Every structure is written in C-alpha cells, then in structure tokens.
Design a protein with these regions (language model features):
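Structural detector for internal amphipathic alpha-helices that build alpha-solenoid repeat scaffolds
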Residues: 2-23, 30-37, 42-54, 61-69, ...
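TPR/TPR-like (Sel1-like) alpha-helical repeat modules
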Residues: 67-69, 302-309
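Short alpha-helical hairpin
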Residues: 108-110
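Active-site glycine/GP-rich loop and adjacent strand/helix microenvironment
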Residues: 297
C-alpha cells in the first residue's frame, strides 16, 4: 500500500501532468494515457482518481473526444492506441471515470458535458456521449443510441446495444429489436442477448415486433414473450416448429413446453395443417412431451404415442383434430 504522504505527492504530480496536457502539452497527454493503458491496475487507479480530483470541465470534454475520436486536440491521444489491448484499457478507464462519481459536483460536471455532447454536430461525439450516459442509466440517451444503431459503425452499434441492456427499461426494447433485424452476425447476437437481459421490460417491444415484416424477427419476438410467459406469442412461435434451422426448431419446442397448456392448441393446429416431416415430428414431440403438467401429458397421451414412433402425417393429423375438438370442451 502507498503511504498517505507519498500517495498525496503522486496525485499532485498527476494533477500537474493533467494540467499541462490541458494547456496543450501533447507529451504530457501521451503520458496520461500511458497511465490509463497500463496493465498495472494501481497506476490506472491513480490517474482515474486524479481525473476526479481535478474538477475541470475541459478535462471531461477532452476525455469524451478521446473515447469518440481517439484524439487529444488534433493529434492521436496516445501512441499506445496502436496496441489494440492497450487501446481497450484506455477506453475502459475513460468509461469507468465517467460512470463513477466521487461527489455531487463531480456527477453534475460530467452529466453537463455528456448532455452537451449529445447535441454535437459530429455524430461520433453524440454516440460516445449517449453511450456514457446510457452506462449511467440515463434514459435521455435512448434516442441517440437508437440513432447509433441506425447509422453508426459496427463498434458503436455494439456499444449502443451494451448501454441499452444496462438501462433495462422498456424504452430500450424497440431500438434493440431494430438491432436484432440488422443482420445475423455479432450485432444480431448482441441484441438478442440484450433483449433477454431486459426480461419483462422488453415485453411491449416484443408484442409490437410480432407484426415485423421479417419472419425471423417475429419468431425472436415470440420466443422472448414465451420466455416471460406471455401466451400472445404462441401463434407465431409455433412457426418455428417447422423451420429449416434445427436450433430454431429446438428452441421453439423448449419455449412452447414451458408455456404448457396454453401452447397446445397452436401445436395441434400445426400438426393438422402441415405435412408431418421428420423434423416437425421430432420438434412437436419434444414440445408436447416436455410440458410439465401431468394432466396435460395424460390428455396428450394418444398423440405422444403416435409421435414417438414413425407415424404417418394422416395418423397424427387425425388424433390432433380429435384432441383439438375436445381441448376446451
């Protein structure tokens, strides 16, 4: 542990370094970021503590610019940006400094800078400011994060998704559905995880997405509703039982099973209306056989026996029709 007096001297030295950087000394700025990019956590913490102690709005504006553009004034903020791991540590340190408050004055200073940043003419600064406000769970960031999902590059799309997930508010659901529809790559995957983290806060966005023009997005919305026990998903969710993708078929079956009796009529309709291919037979059997209710199992016993074997489409359809007719009687 650093003795108290020595620690104070170190902070005075770092404060002087920061002041020189703010006055235009690029070598001092480079040294500041050498601290923030260090693998030594103690060095990073000393500099982060000093950022808070200085209480200078110019510093927070510079740091916002560094996160958005990797620039200190008009030059690269740090030579170590050329090392991806060091650059990631710099960004993480900046984010941590913006999110953690040591006083009310510290908090107000940063929020003022970030709100100004969201109105900047440079989209990259807007996205960075909204991202940091989102990490602080400030819902005023949502419209700019939504814009980032529409227009930003891949990195800032992922950061926007991260911030929306952290806020865990129903207003975050619609932008995440938009991100889900972007592609089938990392943005899609990140949005899917974020929606899952929102849990019930995503419900209204899921319901709206049941009418999405993209069938795959409708299925994701239905699956999300199924996970939170909302039976409005069932009629769309069952489409996943005959999807070409095996992972979608099995994920569909698991969610339908958790919905138990409320999912049965829709599954029966699928078996009545569609040819019983082997993939559909397996997925339907898995959904029905995995339902937790003993009463449901007993009612479905004739159909489960047929689906367990190599039944014909006609056999399964006939039994499904009888069960459906009797289901609510």
């Amino acid at each position: 542990m650093i003795p108290e007096k020595q620690s104070t001297l170190l902070h005075k030295a770092e404060a002087s370094l920061l002041q020189r950087a703010l006055d235009g000394d690029t070598q001092a700025a480079n040294t500041v970021f050498n601290y923030l990019s260090s693998t030594n956590q103690n060095l990073r913490q000393i500099m982060e503590d000093t950022l808070h102690e200085l209480q200078d709005d110019r510093l927070w504006r510079h740091l916002l610019r560094c996160l958005a553009l990797q620039r200190w004034d008009d030059q690269l903020d740090c030579e170590r940006r050329r090392d991806p791991e060091a650059s990631a540590r710099i960004d993480a340190a900046i984010c941590e400094a913006f999110v953690e408050d040591v006083s009310e004055e510290d908090r107000e200073l940063k929020i003022t800078v970030l709100r100004e940043g969201m109105a900047h003419s440079d989209a990259r600064l807007r996205y960075a400011a909204a991202y940091l406000l989102g990490l602080r769970k400030d819902l005023r960031a949502v419209p700019i994060l939504d814009e980032a999902i529409d227009s930003a590059d891949h990195q800032w799309q992922l950061r926007a998704i991260q911030a929306l997930a952290i806020m865990k508010h129903e207003h975050c659901g619609r932008p995440l559905i938009k991100a889900l529809a972007k592609d089938r790559g990392t943005v899609h995957q990140a949005a899917n995880r974020a929606l899952h983290e929102l849990d019930t806060a995503a419900q209204s966005a899921y319901v709206e997405a049941l009418n999405h023009p993209n069938r795959h997005i409708r299925w994701h919305a239905a699956r999300g509703l199924g996970h939170i026990g909302d039976a409005r998903c069932v009629d769309i969710l069952v489409e996943g039982l005959y999807d070409d993708n095996q992972s979608i078929r099995w994920a569909t079956a698991r969610v339908l099973a958790n919905l138990d009796r409320s999912a049965v009529p829709a599954i029966l309709n699928v078996l009545i209306e569609h040819t019983l291919t082997e993939p559909l037979r397996e997925a339907s059997f898995h959904a029905l056989n995995s339902m937790p209710s003993a009463q449901t199992h007993e009612q479905l016993r004739p159909l489960l026996l047929v689906l367990r074997g190599s039944s014909t489409s006609t056999q399964a359809s006939a039994i499904a029709q009888r069960l459906l007719a009797d289901w609510h009687s």
